[in-house]
């Protein structure tokens, strides 16, 4: 048997695993960092296999497999290859046809995986067909050796050794899919033993004999929801890379999934790309291939990896792009355009999912836009310069040219003004919209735009003049006031050599900066240097005000990543507190406040349901894909079981946009009341209680503070993630 979908039990236990990992790291921070430092001097030779100078473009079978369990057959892969050839997309660079998990049926006389004879009767003929279409063929496998090959104890090709001779003793799991104990099904290889590398060479030689051009090595640890060294596939990754070099065939190697950044030097040295996230597909968790929260996860994770990508050190793989099959993709057209813009900006491989025979007109227009696709081939991955409701990414191409992405992370329409000083220059002599192919500049001082919900702009900007860095003051977390379980821990890569962990899961478990001083009241930029593996969020408060949300992600508890958000500060001393009542935030290194108080103020305000006033049976609870990693549940079924936002503040009386991010499986209703007025019924539908879905309605508010309540006296209401209030445009 081969793994197909990720074992749901592993995902269900992810949060408890992270909590355990967190405690281990705080008590012994050198356990993994020492290994990281030993490896930091390793030379990068990810390109020794002759590929990987630029991210590839292609298609993968996995997304379609998640909604059609019988999809993975030779006949269907042949059809997809023919569809790619007929689509015209190869002229735009799409070349790879990648077969994911489930193709293998047994093992040959030398313990090497061979195809299922029923579903893949002639894989060499299939690969020849793919090559005949002018494409490249990819295949999936995993580290270690599976039980049938171990039980057969087959001889290793060209050696005197047998499969059992190369296994780690005592027997233990050889990848993230392996069971605990000494009967793991997926057995670990000991690469210090003779015959081990030769076995890997023989497997890759078999793939090469079929004509394979790409290998996805899945379940690699540290990573893949297993962040310790109990499995440790670093030696496997090195062995696969060496085997590819020995084969003499140019074969791209991608390792997967959610890799541990503490061992980045190994991943950079031996692989062309590494998956930095969980799967983008819902895999039964929603009714579509993917949805916006899964895309947003990539925006959260990427800042921690943004300095790790490039032509000689491999690429950050954000997983499949399901953007060309219409409604089954689970994304609006604006979301699809934003997703492709983001993948391109950060130079991630662009791997289409879904069924290539069903590409719709909008999807085909997206993936055949050569100006947008060229952004992904610059070899200069973009970096985030602004986080929050509007995110900005920029890639400096040299000679005054920049690729710039501006993203609206909310479902409301918003207006944004981006000062060019944020990007390091004063003015723009030319601005080109890469989606519309139109010149929209010059633009002095900055760029203003209106963005649809989850919409974006992808720009080529030619800047002139130098913008001097704004004055900045740093504040170390270990020097701030620690509350509750917050604790200082060693962190050699952190500013000052220390960090603060133990935050969250209680309102008192926080770190408070009491001495944040500015000369003038206004909007500043706050850089937050934090560390996490996977998704975590801060709920922070300025001067005792309402909670504000900073959603983060990453791949290390030892390597700080920076993200910057706008923050309003009063003249003089301010207090900023970081924590979260219902979830774990990232560990915190420091914050830095910069600017002169004149940064453009965000147009919208977010209010988290889990920290609103919860009545009756309503509870605030952890929710992995929700804003702030929390939501309010058990709403309705009684008049008292409601959520009340009592601090919704707007500058003037009028009609505003109200975004409601909810979670439900099936039809449920809210009864919403504004300022104690008559209730409005909102009938909502959804397919999951894990991934929030937005709806946007107009709402009349008066100047100052307003109250908005959600409940259902006679029936159950959806769970509630947050609301967003924004002006109407």
Regions found by a protein language model. Give the residues of each.
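Aromatic-lined carbohydrate-recognition surfaces of secreted/lumenal glycan-active proteins
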Residues: 136-150, 241-262
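Extracytoplasmic
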Residues: 414, 423-428, 451, 455-729
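Glycan-recognition surfaces
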Residues: 172-178, 192, 246-355
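Conserved structural scaffold segments of CAZyme catalytic domains across common CAZy folds
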Residues: 42-136, 144, 347-385, 401, ...
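Glycan-recognition and catalytic regions of carbohydrate-active enzymes
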Residues: 347-410, 492-504, 512, 572, ...
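Aromatic-lined carbohydrate-binding/catalytic grooves of carbohydrate-active enzymes
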Residues: 65, 80, 84-227
């Amino acid at each position: 048997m081969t793994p197909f979908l990720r074992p749901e039990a592993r995902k269900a236990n992810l949060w408890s695993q992270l909590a355990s990992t967190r405690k281990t790291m705080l008590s012994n921070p050198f356990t993994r960092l020492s290994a990281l430092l030993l490896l930091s001097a390793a030379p990068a030779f990810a390109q020794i296999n002759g590929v990987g100078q630029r991210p590839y473009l292609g298609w993968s079978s996995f997304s379609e497999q998640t909604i059609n369990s019988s999809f993975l057959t030779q006949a269907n892969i042949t059809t997809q290859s023919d569809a790619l050839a007929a689509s015209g997309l190869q002229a735009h660079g799409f070349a790879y046809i990648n077969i994911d998990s489930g193709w293998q049926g047994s093992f040959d006389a030398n313990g090497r995986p061979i195809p299922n004879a029923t579903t893949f009767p002639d894989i060499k003929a299939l690969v020849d067909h793919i090559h005949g279409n002018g494409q490249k063929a990819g295949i999936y496998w995993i580290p270690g050796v599976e039980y049938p090959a171990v039980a057969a104890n087959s001889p290793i090709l060209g050696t005197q050794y047998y499969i059992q001779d190369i296994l780690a003793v005592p027997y233990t799991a050889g990848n993230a899919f392996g069971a605990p104990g000494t009967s793991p099904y997926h057995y670990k290889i000991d690469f210090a033993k003779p015959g081990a590398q030769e076995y890997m060479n023989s497997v890759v030689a078999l793939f090469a004999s079929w004509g394979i051009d790409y290998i996805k090595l899945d379940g690699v640890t540290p990573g893949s929801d297993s962040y310790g060294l109990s499995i440790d596939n670093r030696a496997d990754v090195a062995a696969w890379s060496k085997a590819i070099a020995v084969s003499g065939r140019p074969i791209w190697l991608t390792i997967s999934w959610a890799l541990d950044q503490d061992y980045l030097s190994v991943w950079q040295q031996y692989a062309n790309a590494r998956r930095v996230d969980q799967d983008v597909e819902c895999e039964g968790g929603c009714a579509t291939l993917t949805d916006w929260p899964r895309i947003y996860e990539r925006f959260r994770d990427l800042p921690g990896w943004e300095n790790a990508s490039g032509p000689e050190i491999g690429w950050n793989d954000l997983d499949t792009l399901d953007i060309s099959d219409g409604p089954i993709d689970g994304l609006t057209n604006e979301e699809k355009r934003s997703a492709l813009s983001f993948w391109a900006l950060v130079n991630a491989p662009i791997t289409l999912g879904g069924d290539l025979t069903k590409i719709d007109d909008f999807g085909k227009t997206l993936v055949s836009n050569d100006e947008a696709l060229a952004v992904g081939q610059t070899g200069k991955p973009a970096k985030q310069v602004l986080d929050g409701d509007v995110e900005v990414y920029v890639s400096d191409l040299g000679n005054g040219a920049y690729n710039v992405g501006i993203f609206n992370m909310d479902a409301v329409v918003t207006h944004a003004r981006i000062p060019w000083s944020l990007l390091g220059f004063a003015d723009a002599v030319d601005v080109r919209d890469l989606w519309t192919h139109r010149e929209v500049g010059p633009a002095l001082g900055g760029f203003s735009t209106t963005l649809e919900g989850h919409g974006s702009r992808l720009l080529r900007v030619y800047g002139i003049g130098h913008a001097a860095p704004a004055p900045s003051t740093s504040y170390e977390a270990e020097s701030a006031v620690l509350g509750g379980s917050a604790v200082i821990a060693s962190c050699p890569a952190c500013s000052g050599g220390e960090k603060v962990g133990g935050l969250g899961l209680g309102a008192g478990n926080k770190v408070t900066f009491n001495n944040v001083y500015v000369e003038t009241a206004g909007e500043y930029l706050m850089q937050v240097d934090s560390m996490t593996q996977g998704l975590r969020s801060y709920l922070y408060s300025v001067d005792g005000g309402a909670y504000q949300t900073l959603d983060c992600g990453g791949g290390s508890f030892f390597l700080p990543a920076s993200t910057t958000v706008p923050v309003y500060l009063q003249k003089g001393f301010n207090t900023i507190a970081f924590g979260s009542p219902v979830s774990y935030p990232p560990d915190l290194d420091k914050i830095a406040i910069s600017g002169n108080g004149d940064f453009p103020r965000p147009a919208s305000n977010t209010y988290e349901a889990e920290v609103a006033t919860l009545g009756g049976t309503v509870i605030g609870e952890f929710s992995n894909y929700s804003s702030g990693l929390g939501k309010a549940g058990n709403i309705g079924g009684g008049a008292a079981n409601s959520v009340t936002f009592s601090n919704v503040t707007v500058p003037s009386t009028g009609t505003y946009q109200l975004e409601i991010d909810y979670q439900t499986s099936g039809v449920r209703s809210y009864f919403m009341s504004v300022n104690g007025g008559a209730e409005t019924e909102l009938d909502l539908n959804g397919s999951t209680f894990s991934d929030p879905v937005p709806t946007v309605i107009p709402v009349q508010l008066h100047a100052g503070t307003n109250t908005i309540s959600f409940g259902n006296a006679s029936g159950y209401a959806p769970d509630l993630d947050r609301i967003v209030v924004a002006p109407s445009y």
